[in-house]
Curated annotation (Swiss-Prot):
Transmembrane region(s): 32-52, 63-83
Function comment: Causes tubulation when added to magnetosome-derived liposomes, binds liposomes; may be involved in constriction of the cell inner membrane to form mature magnetosomes. Binds preferentially to cardiolipin, a component of bacterial membranes, with very poor to no binding of other tested (phospho)lipids. Addition of cardiolipin to magnetosome-derived lipids increases tubulation. May function with MamX, MamZ amd Mms6.
Cytoplasmic side: 1-31, 84-389
Similarity comment: Belongs to the magnetosome MamY family.
Subcellular location as annotated: Magnetosome membrane
Annotated GO CC locations: magnetosome membrane
Single GO molecular function: lipid binding
Name of protein: Liposome tubulation protein MamY
Membrane topology: Multi-pass membrane protein
Annotated keywords: Biomineralization, Lipid-binding, Magnetosome, Membrane, Transmembrane, Transmembrane helix
Note: This bacteria makes up to 20 cubo-octahedral magnetosomes of about 45 nm in diameter which contain membrane-bound crystals of magnetite (Fe(3)O(4)).
Phenotypic consequence of gene deletion: No growth phenotype, retains a magnetic response. Magnetosome vesicles are slightly bigger than wild-type while magnetite crystals are equal in number but have a much wider size range.
Side Lumenal, residues: 53-62
Gene name of the encoded protein: mamY
Amino acid sequence: MAIAAIMGDVLMLMGFNKAAFGKLNSASRAALIGAVIWAVLSIVYLTIFNGWKNLFTMLPHEFFIVLLSIALPIGLTVLILMLSRIVKSVDTLKSEVTTLSRNDVSSEGSVAMLADLFREHRAAIAAQVEAQVEATTQLIRLNQEGRALAAPAQASGTDEAMTLLAQLFREHREAVAAQLEAQASATAQLVQVTRDSRDGIVDELRSQRVLSQEITQELSQITQSRTVAPAPPGLDPSQRIDRMRALAEVLGLALNDLSMTATQVLTEHLNAAHGDRDGTRKFISTLTTAYFAGDKNVFFRSLVQEAVNRSEQLRRCAEDTESVRQQISKILREAREIRSLVAACDPNDLVRIVFEDGELWALEKALAEHFLIDGSPVWTETAPDSGMD
């Protein structure tokens, strides 16, 4: 079943279409091709030199090493592809923010042009009003002159001339009134259009400003959520993600190696304590199943329980077996290095939050109480200094 699952993962990776493969950078392509070649060569090696029938007769830790050698590059490739997509999404958001800022500049230019247009309209309206005032002044002057001319005519009794002159003045006043009304209506329409255009431009600028703030905030959140290790000022998001990937690869390899070492120590200890190799094999198989189900600390917890509950038997096993001493020394030294690496991170970094004070810390503490840094057992009541901080 495990081999079938691995083959399914390989086929899934090979099933990428050409468009998706073309979007990957050179490093991601090389990692993907390398992982596929690694998986194929591993399967060919198992088929030719080991045989599928002999695969399930291996010891649990040997079977685990075979699975790990096949699945590890595939898992690293999936991680690299995910990080590449994150970098692309961050770059896309940055380009959108840059484009939006350029659009804001063009909108400001449009507003300036519209303001100049409004200024020209106001000047034209002022000129028309001034001309209308001049025409009204001339009308008043003509009216006064007409009255001055009408006075002698009225005294001489010429009613017909007075009637014609009054009709002429009335028609002129009606024409002027109609012109003033049309001018007032046109001015009101221009003011309304100006107000509507101004409100529309203001609303558009506000919406663009809000959109720019939302995109900037989302970009900041993505950058902060992907920041793992403390980096010097001036690093862009892609460099921060590269640091996170490097740290994750180092810690992942170290923890996988520690899990295999803990499995070997457990196997030697249980065989020496109980003498039941079949029972030990079933127990290790159960732990391996739990490990592949997602419990990556199951070997650490089991070894902690043995170090706490059967410390004397574990020390005797290490005293009698050189390989057990070397494996315990390896666990202590690697755990110390991992703890130092995690302690160098910022207290708010994701790596430190995940790994600090975990099962590996408990395993280091339990073993340091009964063993020196070189794996030698301590038989005194007071545990000596093992070189740990």
